[in-house]
């Protein structure tokens, strides 16, 4: 908390149009004295009149990895916007405000703390995620770089857990979202549904033990992408692919793969591999081509061999949406919402 506040006061507040800063993400669920999970960073949201003045960044301060994300002050103009947007409602309800020169964040905190768990707003946030998934459109096909097919599939599967986590009043933006949704489903009497969600990502016949060799390829492409330079310097997620973040991006994923619920590692393997390939696509297409067989091998291990398989996974996700809705209603009913 102190390092994040020092960062907000010492650096971010110097930028024009600064309106405040607060903590977000999984750190808000920790009790006093709890250690931050290995591989996690501390999310610091910086509010500006124009968020374009400050770039999204990751940097180490006092042994903590801070992820700084700018947001527009307009997002906090009224309680309704905050309460219907999960990542705003969760953070404002918890109210870990670092700096609030205008008093706006404190006001939104008081409103969110009172209303964010009401049935109306739980359902509105749940419905927002379901709408996002149902309107995701046709995923890019073979005329785009392979990583551009991987990203919407992997993130779509991850977001499929969000309506359920939202209904249970849990944070969605957690590193181990499939583990989190498994705990919720177990608690609310629907344990069998977890396998339906994870299958969107892993397929039905994946072999967790066989993922280890793909971790070696992920490590290699990460190191190669870290060493590249060129147009990717201006890409938003380039700050995620740096030598200083090796343990966060690769080491933490390897530890999850070796845990009792390795499905969460698959999401991060795909997301990180795709980001590394985007860096190489921008900077060094020869290196990108050299790692393409490794990405194809990882996809094949998950049952993805071409465009038809991506399309089938999207259809599988769309078909599951009514059941996700039904599960969330069951959870809300049990919670008296």
Named regions from a protein language model:
Residues 1-19, 26-96:
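Metal-dependent nucleotidyltransferase catalytic core
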Residues 16, 27, 105-112, 153:
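Short hydrophobic/aromatic-rich motifs at helix boundaries and adjacent loops
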Residues 122-337:
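Conserved nucleotidyltransferase catalytic core and NTase-mimicking acidic/glycine-rich helix/loop elements
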């Amino acid at each position: 908390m102190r390092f994040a506040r020092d960062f907000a006061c010492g650096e971010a507040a110097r930028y024009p149009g600064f309106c405040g800063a607060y903590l977000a993400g999984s750190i808000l669920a920790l009790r006093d004295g709890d250690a931050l999970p290995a591989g996690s960073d501390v999310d610091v949201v910086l509010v500006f009149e124009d968020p374009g003045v400050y770039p999204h960044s990751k940097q180490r301060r006092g042994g903590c990895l801070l992820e700084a994300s700018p947001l527009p002050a307009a997002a906090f103009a009224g309680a309704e916007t905050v309460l219907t947007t999960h990542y705003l409602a969760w953070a404002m309800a918890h109210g870990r405000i670092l700096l609030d020169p205008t008093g706006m964040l404190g006001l939104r905190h008081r409103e969110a703390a009172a209303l964010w768990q009401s049935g109306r707003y739980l359902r509105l946030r749940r419905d927002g995620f379901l709408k996002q998934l149902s309107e995701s459109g046709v995923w890019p096909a073979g005329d785009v770089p392979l990583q551009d097919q991987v990203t919407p599939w992997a993130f779509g599967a991850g977001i499929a857990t969000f309506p359920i986590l939202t209904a249970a009043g849990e944070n969605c933006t957690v590193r181990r979202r499939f583990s989190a949704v498994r705990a919720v489903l177990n608690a609310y009497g629907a344990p069998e549904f977890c396998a339906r969600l994870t299958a969107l990502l892993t397929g039905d016949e994946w072999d967790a033990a066989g993922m280890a060799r793909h971790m070696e390829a992920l490590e290699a492409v990460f190191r190669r992408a870290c060493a590249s330079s060129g147009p990717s310097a201006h890409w938003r997620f380039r700050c995620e692919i740096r030598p200083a973040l090796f343990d966060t991006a690769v080491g933490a994923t390897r530890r999850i793969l070796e845990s009792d619920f390795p499905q969460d590692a698959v999401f991060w393997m795909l997301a990180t591999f795709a980001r590394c390939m985007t860096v190489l696509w921008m900077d060094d297409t020869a290196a990108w081509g050299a790692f393409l067989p490794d990405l194809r091998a990882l996809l094949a291990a998950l049952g993805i061999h071409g465009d038809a398989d991506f399309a089938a996974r999207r259809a599988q996700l769309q078909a599951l949406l009514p059941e996700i809705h039904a599960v969330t209603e069951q959870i809300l009913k049990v919670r008296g919402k």
